[in-house]
């Protein structure tokens, strides 16, 4: 494990930095990534970043897994016994780095995603939370009034230094051999926790606010969109090369309601990032997005993640091939015989086509997933070659379904 002393020494020795986003970001006081990390030609960039941008001529699809660092790994379980608090594990630089690197060392995925949580930035905007073993996240004072929205603060990065420090260390540790991913929650998804006070199966409070207190909800979502935008820029300036936006509970909304209450705030974020950090690909993942695919295309993101309930070939037809896709092997296939998993990987890759595809699961890795299956997933992906899989095929230009 990387010690606190080693962490401090690394950060003290970090070179002078220059922003990887547009230069006028300097006025915001956000930390900036070092020039050595910011300048790389397309051919030097990680495979995942190039696939996210939809570049031609890649040899194979890159692969990573949502929740690839975590509870299914024996190494993580041993660490969690020594550090039983999830908040400690996800808010301590040396632990974040160690946990993030565990699957990288074991399986060498093409993407290494920061070990964190979508709720991590909440205390930095004035919303404290706890995590209960039985209930999950708990927010003692749910935000449901105009006065409470006014009390929210601009995001304070002094309270998130562990995120920036971890990303800087990870970018150096990975050393260009994979893409470093950061992530955020979408405003609607974060708001579900803030309004409901934690996890919920019904979303009745926040859904009713759409009608009973729409101005309060708009104020909350707008504040979250601003904070999340700044948080993305902070992650990019600390070393993240690609950002995934999780609208985990957007799929709990009827499509027309998602269009009104989630999509505009995602677009607000994307528009700002495309101005401030135009070279950083953005991935949008919504669990249960089969009814939303066509509505997701004009959010401005570079990649749309598909969950496993959407057939990849159908998803590609509906989205067209001018936008990249991510996914979407059912996590349960990792419990199947390895030849079955191999066949499913081949099916998904062939369905996605030879361009603009990041192989992933359709959801996070399940708790008891065999590590052997995870290793096999990445071994198979590394063995793939587009020129063999699509030999003699002519790529059809697909326009998104209107």
From Swiss-Prot:
Keywords: Chlorophyll biosynthesis, Chloroplast, Decarboxylase, Lyase, Plastid, Porphyrin biosynthesis, Transit peptide. It is an enzyme of class 4 (lyase). One of its GO terms (molecular function) is uroporphyrinogen decarboxylase activity. Substrate binds at residues 67-71, 86, 116-117, 193, 248, 363. One of its GO terms (biological process) is protoporphyrinogen IX biosynthetic process. Pathway: Porphyrin-containing compound metabolism; protoporphyrin-IX biosynthesis; coproporphyrinogen-III from 5-aminolevulinate: step 4/4. Its EC number is 4.1.1.37. CDD domains: URO-D (cd00717). Homodimer. Catalyzes the decarboxylation of four acetate groups of uroporphyrinogen-III to yield coproporphyrinogen-III. PANTHER family: METHYLTETRAHYDROFOLATE:HOMOCYSTEINE METHYLTRANSFERASE RELATED, UROPORPHYRINOGEN DECARBOXYLASE 1, CHLOROPLASTIC. This is Uroporphyrinogen decarboxylase 1, chloroplastic. It comes from Oryza sativa subsp. japonica.
